[in-house]
């Protein structure tokens, strides 16, 4: 039928409008307020955070490139562990927050969600631009 379709597997979105109960906004807000950052397990779960502006850019490219067709990973190069995210928040926000391990198990410890961007880059020219550090500082200024 000649209808081109594209689906996107979006990794962990960050930025304006994201669910405030997820780990990224929670850690940024707590670090900004000097509250303790609580980690489950070893804090070794790795996620790749992608800013909503990068998501919008990819969707725009998909719509207007005329080349998008298939399933794409929509992510960035911001793969960090939960512990690294906590440390970045404390450092960048010059916070007195402590990073505390709850003692509770995280069934996803050692899980790594870091996907290839090769397909989306080749097909529509998507390249993420916003670094995790920029996203943390931006969210802190909004919170």
What are these model-derived regions, one by one?
Residues 10-11, 22, 45-46:
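N-terminal start-of-chain detector that recognizes signal peptides
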Residues 16-23:
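Short beta-loop-alpha junction of Rossmann-like oxidoreductase domains
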